[in-house]
C-alpha cells in the first residue's frame, strides 16, 4: 500500500520556498557557527526568523490562536523533512526542541497567564 503525501499547490509552494531558503540561507551558517558563537548566531538568525514569520511558517506545530500555523501532522512532517537537513533550521522556523514540545504542553495545560507569557 502506497501512502500519498502530496499536498495542495499553495502548500507545495511553501515547501519549495523552505527547501531553497534552508539551502541558501541556513546551511551557510553551519560553516561559521563556531566563529559567531551563541550570541552572534542568535543575531544572525533573527532576520531569517522574520522572513519565516512573514511567509506564515513560524511555529507551524502550534494552533493559530497561540501564534502558530496549525498545519497538521502530515504537513508538519513534510516541513520537518526539509528542516531536518540542518541542525539550525528548526530554530529559524520556531519549532526547535525542547521549545516545540514545551510549547505544546503549555498550549494544552498551561494557565492563561503562562500562555500569554511564553507562547
Give, region by region, the residue ranges found by the protein language model.
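Solvent-exposed alpha-helix faces
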Residues: 16-19, 84
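Short, compositionally biased low-complexity segments
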Residues: 1, 20-23, 93
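Intrinsic disorder at enzyme termini
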Residues: 1-15
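Glycine-rich flavin
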Residues: 28-119
Amino acid at each position: 500500500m502506497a501512502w500519498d503525501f502530496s499536498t495542495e499547490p499553495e502548500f507545495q509552494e511553501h515547501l519549495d520556498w523552505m527547501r531553497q531558503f534552508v539551502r541558501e540561507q541556513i546551511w551557510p551558517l553551519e560553516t561559521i557557527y563556531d566563529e559567531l558563537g551563541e550570541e552572534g548566531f542568535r543575531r544572525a538568525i533573527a532576520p531569517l526568523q522574520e522572513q519565516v514569520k512573514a511567509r506564515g511558517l513560524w511555529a507551524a506545530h502550534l494552533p493559530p490562536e497561540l501564534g502558530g500555523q496549525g498545519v497538521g501532522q502530515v504537513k508538519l512532517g513534510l516541513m520537518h523533512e526539509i528542516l531536518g537537513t540542518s541542525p539550525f533550521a528548526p530554530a529559524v522556523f520556531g519549532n526547535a526542541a525542547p521549545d516545540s514540545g514545551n510549547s505544546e504542553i503549555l498550549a494544552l495545560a498551561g494557565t492563561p497567564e503562562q500562555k500569554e507569557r511564553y507562547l
